[in-house]
Regions:
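Polytopic membrane enzymes that build or remodel cell-surface glycoconjugates and lipids
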Residues: 1-242
Length: 242
């Protein structure tokens, strides 16, 4: 399978300005869809994870931030715990601040999905049939992700910060890999993919499946076979899997 990079210009002029307009439209749609959620109170696990959790009230000692206790609801999830520490440092228990961060993370995951879908459709195997519509298709997929009702629990239920962070880092892992796999090879993007994978694993345990998904993506859209994928990026996969 050829791996020549298809230029963004092949996407019927889906230029940076249009990308910026798309991002603005998606952000506006998210804000409208969740406009009535800013005052949703702390519920259920939020009480243990946020309201009654003394470990988010200080960033010291640093070891406690990176190793939250199991009873806090974010045990073994230091990135999620760190985000709550930062939330509390800025706004205390003001619920709107936590909703704002959840919405921002949700939007970022949608944008990562937009970039992943668009670049995938511009790959040589798909570009002849779908490349000219890559931007529009990616926008539709991202909008569906951002606005689908199934997302409301992870966005508005504040202790589900772990889920949102995991989704964001999962998509960033795939997006950065897609960028890194473009010829002539971009090791910086592959390194960013590995870092995103590590961050996701520090947010929620299900992230452990990400390296498998990256290998499947490599097989289907880039290398054409598992053997070719391994031969081309044998240094990458053991690190990502670890």
């Amino acid at each position: 399978m050829t791996t020549n990079r298809i230029p963004v210009a092949a996407d019927h002029g889906f230029a940076p300005r249009r990308v910026a307009l798309t991002i603005g439209a998606l952000a506006g749609a998210v804000l409208i869809a969740y406009a009535n959620t800013w005052s949703v109170p702390f519920l259920f696990d939020d009480i243990v994870t946020i309201v009654d959790n003394p470990t988010i009230r200080s960033a010291r000692p640093w070891s406690s931030v990176l190793s939250p206790a199991a009873h806090t609801g974010v045990g073994g999830r230091p990135i999620a715990h760190l985000s709550l520490v930062c939330n509390y440092a800025i706004g205390g228990e003001a619920v709107a601040g936590y909703h704002g961060v959840n919405l921002a993370l949700h939007l970022l995951s949608g944008l990562a999905l937009f970039g992943l879908v668009r670049r995938t459709l511009l790959r040589p195997a798909l570009a002849p049939g779908l490349g000219s519509h890559a931007g529009a298709i990616a926008t539709a997929v991202a909008a569906l992700w951002l606005l689908h009702p199934v997302q409301t629990q992870s966005v508005t239920y504040l202790s589900q910060r772990t889920e949102i962070l995991m989704a964001l880092f999962y998509l960033c892992t795939l997006y950065c890999f897609a960028r890194g796999a473009e010829p002539p090879g971009r090791p910086g993007w592959l390194a960013a993919s590995v870092l995103s994978c590590f961050a996701g694993m520090a947010s929620k345990e299900v992230m452990v499946t990400a390296p498998v998904m990256v290998l499947l993506y490599d097989w289907v859209f880039v290398a054409g076979s598992v053997r070719s994928a391994w031969q081309a990026r044998w240094r990458y996969y053991p690190i990502a899997r670890s």
